[in-house]
Amino acid sequence: MQIEINRIEYEEMETRETMDFDAFKNFSNKIKWINLFFIITVVAMHCVREWETYYGRSDSAISSFLINLEVYAMACFFMMSGFWLFYEYEKYTYFEMIRKKIYSIFVPYILWGVLNLIIVQAVSLVETGQMKYSALDSIKSLLFIQIGTINFQPLNDPLWYLIRIMTYFIVAPVLYYLIKNKVVGAISLLVLAMASSSFGYYSFGRWLFVFCFGGYIGLHYKENIIKAANRPRGISLAFTLLIYIALCALYPYLNAHEMIKKDIDIIAIIIVLGIIILGKNPSIEMKHSNYAFMLYCAHMILMPFLVKIVGLILGNWVDEGVCQGIVVLVCGFIVAIIYLVLKKFAPGVYRVLAGGRNG
């Protein structure tokens, strides 16, 4: 009898562990799809900005819409980075975590920056007979430093996120002590929320609140958020993203209200959590998650060429916003080809450029 009871208890425990693993796997898959969506919005925004660099300000309503799609993307990236860090924070020692992040973040940051620099220098050499950047300026083009009057942005502009998130990982022990207690953590988040809007967009303090909020959930409410995200009932993830797109279309009108401008991080958190919780788990497994990372790192290398080509071919007879949408699609397609070719024929290069990530 006792043996039978033990067997039943063991089977129940095994079933519970399997369910927990499945719930985590489904949650992780959902986040990968959401991450890809927001990376595409970043690509769309940069496409419009690059187009305006060559052809002047775009008056197309589609262009404004493409820019507004990205408005909450960075909050999503920082929040989920904080969540994943503190979700498994006690699994590694500090130096193990830093070593892992150097390989997955800092090394790709340098390599993608150098690759972009080489291409820019080569194009300049062909077009003008001389390199665009001196040796010193080449080094500066790889940096992301903002201290007082010193202000260097990476030549591959989207990479600023990688180095900013790396600084948060470096000070993770301090952030951990800020949020490890629920009450003290909540007070710390309140202080950070009030202070974050006073910092510049790229500064250390600007995204600290959103990052720590994600970490706070990862420490104290990870089971709750994963359980909520795995609700059997809900609307499709695609439909929740369509709702987000509709909200972004209304953003210029909503942004006219001072409260929305001031509390943009709070609104971003609500929107991101809403997408995660309300959207049902996708039935399709994301098997190529590294594609999203490579798209984020590579799109600005391709963008100047694609904008010029599409502008020359279609710019005179197609709406600028439509042209920009075509650039985004072509960019995504080219990166997909590069991703698949590297993964199949140069797996070592692929893994280094992808930061050793699986997928």
Language model segments and positions:
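Interfacial loop-to-helix transition and helix-capping segments at the boundaries
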Residues: 62-74, 150-164, 195-213, 247-272, ...
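Specific transmembrane alpha-helix
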Residues: 74-87, 166-176, 194, 199-228, ...
